Amino acid sequence: MVIFHYISVLVPTTLAVATPYVLRRNGFDNEQKYRWLLYVACLLFFISWYLPSPLIDGQDTSFTTHFVGGGLFTGLFWAYLVSSMKWRAHWLVMAFSVFALVSALGCINELAELFMVKAGLASIKLDDTNWDILANTLGAATIWIGWIIANFMTKKGRLSGDSGN
């Protein structure tokens, strides 16, 4: 379906251009230091559309697409935003924020899928939403756990990098 090829290019390109502009415009001039996170996230989003996904319980799913392009993408996008804004909070608040972001973007995606099907722009099954939500959440959780480990190791002096200052 041609529309998905457009989405795979348009969404990450728009985010890669617009997000740094919006952050700089709002006083977050340090975002360029973390822009690589944004670019990796956008690359994962693009690649995810072309990865094969497994059958689950005999059902054709887009699990890999949602894990990589939904969850890992959102987790890295979140890490870029949090780092650029130098936002720090209790670990539980940070966990909730990444979960809220992946849930919101996942909901927008599912609504977009429904719209495209009902408008005749795409012919896809809409019965794998539960697997999509799980894949999005697992992908974002993977990034969040990596974030926690990296922060812990940086504080212990085992990793060189930004200590949050």
Where are these regions (language model features)?
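Bulky hydrophobic segments
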Residues: 1-127, 138-165
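Divalent-cation-assisted or electrostatically stabilized phosphate/pyrophosphate-binding catalytic cores
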Residues: 132
